[in-house]
């Protein structure tokens, strides 16, 4: 018999110590990785529930196992909330991750060797949009598009590449682009050659849910997202569509299960359901507006301090610092800021002279600091501290001084009060 008082702390102290140290790290470090966020205790309650015990291959009302009457309710809640939140008429909440959601879309609609047009990883795209080191770049013939001299997506280039190469699918979405994407323009280009428009909105899903960023669902044939990042839910994936194409929906469902996955993670789907409900609250809209405002505030400080921001602005939750002119590598910037308890990630910039393991840039995002309660004043102060570190990247006295300021503001704005 299992007893509810069983715990990790007494049974596996080695593991528990690492878990507790991670709690301390999150509380005492400022998190600026654009893809990271803090999920609510309600989501964690769902993920730690007995739903983890239940196998439920299939879909609500059409399972291959018995005993699914209650997990059917859980999954249907998640489906209905996803559709309502994003204005879709189809939702699949089973993908274990954004990458698996993308894989399911490709497998549903493409054959190996088909041509796809996706954003160049070096210009802000994502691994699953055709990077040669990813399955998407190995299975399909990839034609990349990128940004122009101003740092904005070059739609004329997309149109020209589409006309020349006749891809079966055009992919919209990004992992490091700070502008607004014209989804209607991308659909127009896709329609001009009879291609699917597939949008991966993983990074901006929370902003879209709150009306802060344009919604691709009315324009794209298929949309995927993660459920974490700006959406602030559990780690997982989601597929959406609109337009009433039941054959497309059947293909997508079959591609997820049994095509790419077996049993769904019902405890995670419960977490998704909770997060989707939270995303419908007025407080969530206010949070997303603050995320965007904080990013703009940080950009203003970096520009005023003489740092180059790719495209010179941000229209979402993230931006890229280009450190080429400062003769600082992304790797060194990442490490120095880390010593000050400020967590970022090194990131390639357009036409980067350094390798992806070194890079010449840093990606910065504001979802996590905003979740702590930071507003523009704190965001500006933080950006100033980061400039102080980067201006004195080999001065450990300065870095330690900034670290103490970081510890103080983290204590003032705890992640979990």
UniProtKB/Swiss-Prot annotation:
CDD domains documented for this protein: SHMT
Cofactor needs: pyridoxal 5'-phosphate
PROSITE patterns listed in its UniProt record: SHMT
Gene Ontology CC: cytosol
Catalytic activity: (6R)-5,10-methylene-5,6,7,8-tetrahydrofolate + glycine + H2O = (6S)-5,6,7,8-tetrahydrofolate + L-serine
Record SUPFAM superfamilies: PLP-dependent transferases (SSF53383)
N6-(pyridoxal phosphate)lysine PTM sites in chain numbering: 229
GO terms of molecular function: glycine hydroxymethyltransferase activity; pyridoxal phosphate binding
InterPro entries for this protein: PyrdxlP-dep_Trfase, PyrdxlP-dep_Trfase_major, PyrdxlP-dep_Trfase_small, Ser_HO-MeTrfase, Ser_HO-MeTrfase-like, Ser_HO-MeTrfase_PLP_BS, SHMT-like_dom
Biological process annotations from GO: glycine biosynthetic process from serine; tetrahydrofolate interconversion
Subunit description: Homodimer.
Protein name: Serine hydroxymethyltransferase
Species assigned in the record: Photorhabdus laumondii subsp. laumondii (strain DSM 15139 / CIP 105565 / TT01) (Photorhabdus luminescens subsp. laumondii)
Annotated gene: glyA
